[in-house]
Amino acid sequence: MSPSSIRLYLVTAIMSGALIGVAALALPAQAEPRVFELSAPDAREVFLAGEMTNWSDGKVPMRKDADGRWRATIDLDPGQWLYKFVVDGKWIADPGSSDRDADGSGGQHSILFVGPGDWQVRPDIPRGHVDTAMVPSGLRSGGVKVNVYLPPGFERGKPYPVLWLLHGGNMDADQWFRTGHVERYMDNLLAREAIRPFVIVMPSDATSSYAGGSERFISGELPGWLQQTYGLRVDRRSSGVAGMSMGGYGAFRLAYRHPDLYGFAISLSGYFSDSYIASLSKQGTLPMQAVLLCGDKDDLVITNRKLVKALKAGGADFSYREDPGAHTWHYWSLRMVEMLTAADAYFTTGRLPMARN
């Protein structure tokens, strides 16, 4: 039901400004039993479904007690898990949990974090702030939604680096914030001085696939708004882009097309069409530094392998790694620290750490 082990990747070490390496360790996962409960005395049947059950494929029947509450207990490995209840055929978020977000299909999923990690909220440390704005754009009369993470003690006009985070399909700027809780990771990493302060910009893809009008907004209009609003200057030495799923493709595409703005791209489980891969096959070197990561049980691993083959044939310099995992936030949550520390390493040294097996 859950992986028997997870890979924990040690943070890139920086000493005197020099990159000294990235290591990988295979450690046994410390699974924890978790009890899921739902009060539904009139329901005929209730299932637990989520990333831990591959959603409907392995949904777990819940048992009804005399008090009208349905319960199920399963062991979960550390990390983030999305889930829902299926009540007499209707999929619902957990009414007992306030941590939830849009699911991209008109409903909501619930969010659970298991075990100690940088996903935890620590009340004893300084916390950053997330601004939400409808940024004026020629693309939409009402503007385009953007979330901006500002580190603790942010000062307008100070030269902060900028990491752009792109969301997946059918979602918006909230996904990295309200589902991924990237702000928690940032606060914790900053508190223990594992990274230096930088800003995270989470734009909405206003069209699709980060092309056309969406590309013009993100790479054309948004940098000017960031400078006007926060005093931030965006250039390749102090800016990079990352994303998951469709956002992984968007990160690679935007950095490839706008190397003056983005010095690196990190793609998590990106989708790359055959036509896009064909367009890159004869391009040779990449204009940006790039790291591609994908789960070995992700359906999109095939497109990633095709892209890797094409890039290698063209002589491109990049890094690719497959890890245990699927197309889930559980997988991405276990990559989050690596992604953020890699961005910090680039902002500090000018080099993006290569993903090591």
Predicted regions and their residues:
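Boundary at the C-terminal end of the N-terminal hydrophobic targeting segment
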Residues: 26-31
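Bacterial N-terminal signal peptides
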Residues: 11-24
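Non-catalytic cap/lid and distal C-terminal segments of serine-dependent acyl enzymes
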Residues: 32-59, 63-357
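N-terminal secretory signal peptides that target proteins for export/translocation
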Residues: 1-7
